[in-house]
C-alpha cells in the first residue's frame, strides 16, 4: 500500500534522513522508534508532503511520486487519503471539540454541516469524548486534546493515519 524508497532530507549541512526505505502493507501498524532529533517526525512530514524531501520515491495505492518533485495538486490529493495527528495536536483554540473535528470536513471536504456533525459525534464517541463535544481545548486535559485530534483524523476515514508521538499525552484508559 505505501512504500518509501531512498528518501533523503537535509537541513543545511545536517543530513536527517539518509536514504530511508519503508514498506507498510494495508492493516499494518508500524512504529518508528529513535532518540530525539533522529528524524522520526521529519520522515512522517515528508511522507505526508508537509515537508519537502530532497529525494527519494513514494509509492501509494499504485501511484509513484518522486519526492522533491511532487506538485501541490498531487500532494493535496494524496493528503485527502491520509490523516496526521500532530505531536502538539494543532487544535483550534477558539473552537469546541466537535467544531475541531468537523472543521476539515465542512471546509476542506465541502461536506454538508449536518453530515459533518453526525460524523464528528461518532468520531468523538469512538475516542470516549462524546460528553465533551462542547468543550474548548483549554477545558480539556492533554490526553483529551490528543483524543480530539485522533477523532479529527478518523472522521476523514483515511487510508493511513500518521501519528507523531502518539503516546505522549494519552490517558491510560483509552
Language-model-detected regions and their locations in the chain:
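ABC family nucleotide-binding domain
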Residues: 1-174
Amino acid at each position: 500500500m505505501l512504500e518509501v524508497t531512498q528518501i533523503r532530507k537535509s537541513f543545511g549541512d545536517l543530513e536527517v534522513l539518509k536514504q530511508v526505505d519503508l514498506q507498510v502493507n494495508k492493516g499494518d501498524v508500524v512504529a518508528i522508534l529513535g532518540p530525539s532529533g533522529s528524524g522520526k517526525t521529519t520522515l512522517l512530514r515528508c511522507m505526508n508532503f508537509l515537508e519537502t524531501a530532497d529525494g527519494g520515491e513514494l509509492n501509494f495505492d499504485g501511484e509513484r511520486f518522486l519526492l522533491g518533485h511532487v506538485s501541490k495538486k498531487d500532494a493535496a490529493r494524496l493528503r485527502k487519503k491520509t490523516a496526521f495527528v500532530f505531536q502538539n495536536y494543532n487544535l483550534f483554540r477558539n473552537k469546541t471539540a466537535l467544531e475541531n473535528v468537523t472543521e476539515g470536513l465542512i471546509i476542506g471536504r465541502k461536506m454538508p454541516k449536518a453530515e459533518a456533525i453526525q460524523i464528528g459525534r461518532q468520531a468523538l464517541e469512538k475516542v470516549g469524548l462524546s460528553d465533551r463535544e462542547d468543550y474548548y481545548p483549554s477545558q480539556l486535559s492533554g490526553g483529551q486534546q490528543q483524543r480530539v485530534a485522533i477523532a479529527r483524523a478518523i472522521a476523514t476515514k483515511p487510508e493511513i493515519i500518521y501519528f507523531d508521538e502518539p503516546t505522549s499525552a494519552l490517558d491510560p484508559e483509552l
